[in-house]
Amino acid sequence: METVTLRGGDLPWQPVSPALVRARLIVLALAMAIPIVATIVVALVLTPWVWIATGILIVVTAVVGYVVTRQVGAISWIELPEEFVIRKGRVLRSLVAIPYGRLQFVDVQSGPVARAYGIASLQIHTASPQSSGTLPGLPIAQAEELRTRLAALGEAQRAGL
């Protein structure tokens, strides 16, 4: 667990599930399989020069796979007394602080690959798109619990306004 100074104190950031890496790599492999197989077929049937395109596609797939692995490692979140904070990115960093009082609703979404790995995405909606956020790669039970807790905190904060 990494700590970062925010508001003058060291805070424990919660990482997302490592299963998110596997799920995203499966999606990448499925997406790249069609063009790679197509270039192999064309190289075998028409001209061997297409092997260059096959090699390029394989290298691109490997590079994107590495980037995905690093990217997922940079996603974390924390619940603060007044806001929920999502941190993403190593090169293009973003830090989204969502005040509980601005929460409109919270969704839990999970596609077929994510469900197979037992993970879901938590999507937090506010009136402003700039203060909304998505937190991918949470274990399904944790995402459901967090959704319930955030919705309750949002309702309590709005009632106090």
Task: Go through each PLM region and give its residues.
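N-terminal basic, Ser/Thr-rich segments that initiate or prime the first beta/alpha elements at protein or domain
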Residues: 1-161
